[in-house]
From Swiss-Prot:
Gene Ontology CC annotation, any one: virion membrane
Magnesium found in the keyword field: no
Residue intervals passing through the bilayer: 448-468, 480-496
Disulfide bonds: 3-30, 60-116, 60-121, 74-105, 92-116, 92-121, 186-290, 307-338
Protein name, UniProt field: Genome polyprotein
GO biological process: one example: virion attachment to host cell
Stretch list, region Fusion peptide: 98-111
Molecular function (Gene Ontology), one example: protein dimerization activity
Residue spans, topological domain Cytoplasmic: 469-479
Sugar attachment sites: 154
Keywords, sorted A to Z: Clathrin-mediated endocytosis of virus by host, Cleavage on pair of basic residues, Disulfide bond, Fusion of virus membrane with host endosomal membrane, Fusion of virus membrane with host membrane, Glycoprotein, Host endoplasmic reticulum, Host membrane, Host-virus interaction, Inhibition of host innate immune response by virus, Membrane, Suppressor of RNA silencing, Transmembrane, Transmembrane helix, Viral attachment to host cell, Viral envelope protein, Viral immunoevasion, Viral penetration into host cytoplasm, Virion, Virus endocytosis by host, Virus entry into host cell, Zinc
Record topological domains on the Extracellular side: 1-447
A Pfam entry, by short name: Flavi_E_stem
Amino acid sequence: SRCTHLENRDFVTGTQGTTRVTLVLELGGCVTITAEGKPSVDVWLDAIYQESPAKTREYCLHAKLSETKVAARCPTMGPAALAEERQIGTVCKRDQSDRGWGNHCGLFGKGSIVACVKAACEAKKKATGYVYDANKIVYTVKVEPHTGDYVAANETHKGRKTATFTVSSEKTILTLGEYGDVSLLCRVASGVDLAQTIILELDKTAEHLPTAWQVHRDWFNDLALPWKHEGNPHWNNAERLVEFGAPHAVKMDVYNLGDQTGVLLKALAGVPVAHIEGNKYHLKSGHVTCEVGLEKLKMKGLTYTMCDKSKFAWKRTPTDSGHDTVVMEVTFSGSKPCRIPVRAVAHGSPDVNVAMLITPNPTIENDGGGFIEMQLPPGDNIIYVGELSHQWFQTGSSIGRVFQKTRKGIERLTVIGEHAWDFGSAGGFFSSIGKAVHTVLGGAFNSIFGGVGFLPKLLMGVALAWLGLNTRNPTMSISFLLTGGLVLAMTLGVGA
């Protein structure tokens, strides 16, 4: 699965009868949804971008100077003048120079002098700013079912589907082939202040250098370089890259300050680099909150017969995935398709299956299958696939796992924020409370009661509530009632 190869992975486990779960997706992360009677699905936010954003300013990094002209007057002869002073795109400077008999003036003193030069910009020496439009930013969400096929990190799963969202998008339904349909309704949020963000892009001149950065609007507007808007042939403040020398009689030198690319690159050190792909300008941060509908998902292979236990061989022995799960792959030499008999037992309890399958109903197909992912309780375990067996020690502790999943649940609820609550009606408010409880405590509840059936959990919740009602000690009564209520809510709830 896609999530197996990513470091930032989260699990959302639906309760009995779950038809809808709420996910928080961020760039670089991946969420695996598991629900009883449904195929497991990986969902992740693949990209945030805008196609062809609007240009704001262009800055010139290296001036191109031409057609230098100088005019001078003797003392008392009035100001020197050039027609170029009134032309757009020309940089001029007025000054006074020493005049006398040695340079063709009858009087000694200060005479007027003016120099002008035509200023343009060298080719491939521009820095252009682009602005995002929140209404045009596209959020790409990808969905992939767990099919039992091993897919390398650099390969694409054949069952992978893509949905795109903007601020005005409606619900999207994706068809996952034999696994049914999944619906997505996503609320989008960028991780940056778009009104104050500019993408600064340089003309490409060297392959080893980055070409775009994500900068603040005020910093961009304060750059001390010549600038213009798109379509304007003339540069504003072109004098910023031109220097005039000291006047000498009828002469004034004009100097080009040279290429400013190095100065700009030094100023951009440490600034987030922007990614540009064709005409797509990508954002580096952001998230989407998605309501995922699971009601039309269906399990594949339920009608298959069980595989012959004696005809399995390890292709990849059980390995730690890095996500508190175990992954493995087997080959099968018997008749296909069929269902893989897989289970795990803890040390000292040979009759209790402790494996929580992330790959539900693993199968061998005519053209693939055999990849299995499962979660095991901490401690010594034995994994069985048919007649194959493998000793496995799962690191960690049950208490630590509960706290970790609770922390992730709180983080999810915090990111969802105000969208998690519905104050429009009493029913909506109480439904929001239920969803919040599932979001925060769902992972921890599944860690504790993952191997317990629906009916035992229901009876346990009823028993705790009954004890609370019949206990005379107020503190114990409230404790039993709260615990029983939580167990019943997590067992009977349909939201997560």
